[in-house]
From Swiss-Prot:
Its EC number is 4.2.3.156. GO terms for biological process: terpenoid biosynthetic process. It comes from Sinorhizobium fredii (strain NBRC 101917 / NGR234). The lineage of its organism: Bacteria, Pseudomonadati, Pseudomonadota, Alphaproteobacteria, Hyphomicrobiales. This is Hydroxysqualene synthase. It comes from the Bacteria. The keyword Membrane does not apply. PANTHER family: BIFUNCTIONAL LYCOPENE CYCLASE/PHYTOENE SYNTHASE. GO terms for molecular function: geranylgeranyl diphosphate synthase activity; lyase activity; squalene synthase [NAD(P)H] activity. Disulfide bonds: none annotated.
Amino acid sequence: MTSGSGPRSDAMHREKNFPVASWIIHPRHRALILAFYRFVRMADDIADHATLAPDEKLLYLDLLEAELLGKGETRAEAVHLRTALDRRGMPPRHALDLLTAFRMDVTKQRYENWDEVIDYCRYSAMPVGRFVLDVHGESAATWPASDVLCAGLQVCNHLQDCGKDFLNLNRVYIPRDALSASGASIEELGAAKSSLQMLQCLRSLAAKAEVLLNGGGALVSQVKDFRLRFEVSVILSFADKIVSMLKMRDPLRERVHLSPLELLLHGVGAMANEAARRAFGRGTRFKTTVDV
C-alpha cells in the first residue's frame, strides 16, 4: 500500500467532540497536533470503511502502528507523526492507545454496560486530551480531569451519532443494560425517531455524560498554558450546550449539533468568562473531578 492508496472515507470531514489545533492554540504546537489528528483520522477511515473486511482493517491498523514505530515508510500519516514526535522527544504512547480503540471498533460492536463504554473511552478519548496536555508541557496531575472531560465528550458523540452508527456500521455504543432498563431495543436505533423508551434511555446517558463534563471542568484551573486554558473553556462551553440539547432533543429524529453561529457565540462567551476569571478571580466552571 503506497502513501496515496488505501482506505479513505468521509471520516476526515465528520464532526468530533475533541480538541483539534484551533487558532487559540499557540502556533508552535499546531504542526504536531495536526500530525496527530491526521494520523487518527486515517485510523478512523480504516475502522469505519464501508467495504473492507474486518481482517483487512486490522492489517491496515497494524501497518499504521508498525510505521509509527519506525518499521516502514509507506503511510504518510504515520511517518509525519513519527517525525513530529521525534522532533519533540515525545513517545507515541497516546497514538498507540488510540489504535487500540480503533481495533475495538473493528472487533466489538456491542457494549453491555456503562463500565464497558468507559473502558472504551480510556482508549478512544482520554489519550487525545493527554496528548494535547503533554504537547503543552502540562503536568500529568491534569490527566484525571482531562480524562473525565474527554470521556464525557465521547459519550455525547456516541449519543449524537447513535442512529447513524447503527445503520451505517452496525455499531452500538449505547449499553445493552441501559436499553433494557428503559424497555428499549437495539433495533429501535434504526427508526426515524425515538420511542418514549428510547428517549428515556438516551437522556439518562446524556445525564451521565453531564456528570463527566462537570468533573472535567476542574481542568480549566489546572492548566498553566493560558492559550490551552482558553481552548478548554471553549470546549466545555460547547459541551455544556450539546449535552443540554441531548437532554431535550431526539438524535434519531434530528441532527443534534451546534450551528456555526452557536459555535461562535459559545466560544466568545467562554473566552470572556475565562478572561474575567483571570482578571478578577471569578469563574463559573470549577467542579470536582469524578472517578471513571
